[in-house]
């Protein structure tokens, strides 16, 4: 099915939108020359540049500047039973790797246990991204905190080219997490690895008057900006669903131009604001695919990919939509996401 058909009645809304907030000429648009154009002038060492090129240079999107990553850390983050019950095949780590390879992904991101179980067989066949920290839901009552499950050196020794970590910005533990992840990323760069940060918000006060601002463009944009400050090479963020979190909750510092000139209510403009907060796209923005909703997954994934690409983002990191269904359907979904980035007619807004 063609991309335009999957978008349905809103195809023109997404495909023909012109961004009049932050001009595309200001954005470092992903392309085959990302290493030379962006990272060559940075303080990243030669080995880290090699690791970034390994990510950029694998899978169906190889050497386009875009990335498609399969993340499967939900066995810890959301519990293994809840995550894999729809398709028990993925209790076995090898099938996670097979989905990423057969799905044409640039890389697979998962836990120390998952990747370590099959590292000798697969680390040279697809780039590994080891997730350093997790929140687990077996503590009662549930507490939301990211804790380290292993070390950067362990990730290096299993052949990983990159490490990933989550910070719950806005949470009581966020400042400790910032310090921990900053130190881990510094060491990863020293060892020649790339770094990816899950820049998530977590605070019950971010829900106000029936509106959830955990995906507000202004709040997520600032989370991204802190993330690139501690030298994330790629930032993972939820696609913005609203704006004005700072104003609604009544905290932080704002400028009215953030809302009147730099954003509108169009999802591409809201995502463009996220991209801008990653040093105008120098640090690539990958948006998350979100939970699986069944029949609408393909449509939802294509919408997210189109918004991300047209905003100036670098790609999609889609897990549950891909692995909570038969493998052939998961492969089809991943390939369809990649088709958006391979389609030259889908341009930067």
Residues of each region from the PLM?
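N-terminal amphipathic alpha-helix/helix-capping segment at the start of soluble metabolic enzymes
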Residues: 1-78, 83, 116-125, 273
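Glycine-rich beta-strand-to-loop/alpha-helix junction loops that act as flexible
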Residues: 285-291, 318-321
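Hydrophobic alpha-helical scaffolding
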Residues: 42, 264, 294-295, 327
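Short histidine/acidic/glycine/proline-rich micro-motifs that form metal-
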Residues: 169-171, 291-293, 322-324
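Alpha/beta enzyme core
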Residues: 24-29, 62, 75-286, 295-315, ...
């Amino acid at each position: 099915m063609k991309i335009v058909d999957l978008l349905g009645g809103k195809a023109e809304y997404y495909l023909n939108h012109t961004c009049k907030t932050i001009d595309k000429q200001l954005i470092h648009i992903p392309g085959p020359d990302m290493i030379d154009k962006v990272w060559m002038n940075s303080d990243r060492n030669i080995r880290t540049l090699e690791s970034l090129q390994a990510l950029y240079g694998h899978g169906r999107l190889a050497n386009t500047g875009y990335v498609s990553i399969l993340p499967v850390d939900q066995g810890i983050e959301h519990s293994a039973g809840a995550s894999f019950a729809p398709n028990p095949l993925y209790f076995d780590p090898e099938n996670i790797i097979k989905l990423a390879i057969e799905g044409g992904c640039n890389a697979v991101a998962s836990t120390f246990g998952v990747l370590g179980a099959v590292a000798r067989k697969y680390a040279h066949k697809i780039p590994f991204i080891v997730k350093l920290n997790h929140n687990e839901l077996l503590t009662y009552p549930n507490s939301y905190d990211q804790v380290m499950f292993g070390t950067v050196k362990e990730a290096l020794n299993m052949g990983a080219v990159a490490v990933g970590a989550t910070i719950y910005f806005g949470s009581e533990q966020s400042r400790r997490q910032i310090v921990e992840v900053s130190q881990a990323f510094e060491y990863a760069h020293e060892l020649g690895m790339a770094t990816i940060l899950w820049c998530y918000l977590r605070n019950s006060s971010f829900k106000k008057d029936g509106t959830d601002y955990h995906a507000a463009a202004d709040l997520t944009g600032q989370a991204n900006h802190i993330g690139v400050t501690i030298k994330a090479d790629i930032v993972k963020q939820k696609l913005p669903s609203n704006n004005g979190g700072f104003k609604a909750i009544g905290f932080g510092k704002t400028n009215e131009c953030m809302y009147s000139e730099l954003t509108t209510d169009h999802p591409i403009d809201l995502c463009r604001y996220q991209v801008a907060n990653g040093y105008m796209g120098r640090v690539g923005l990958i948006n998350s695919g979100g939970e699986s909703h069944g029949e609408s997954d393909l449509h939802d994934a294509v919408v997210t990919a189109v918004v991300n690409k047209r905003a100036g983002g670098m790609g999609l990191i889609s897990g549950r939509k891909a692995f909570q269904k038969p493998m052939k359907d998961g492969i089809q979904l991943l390939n369809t996401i990649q088709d958006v980035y391979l389609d030259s007619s889908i341009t930067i807004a």
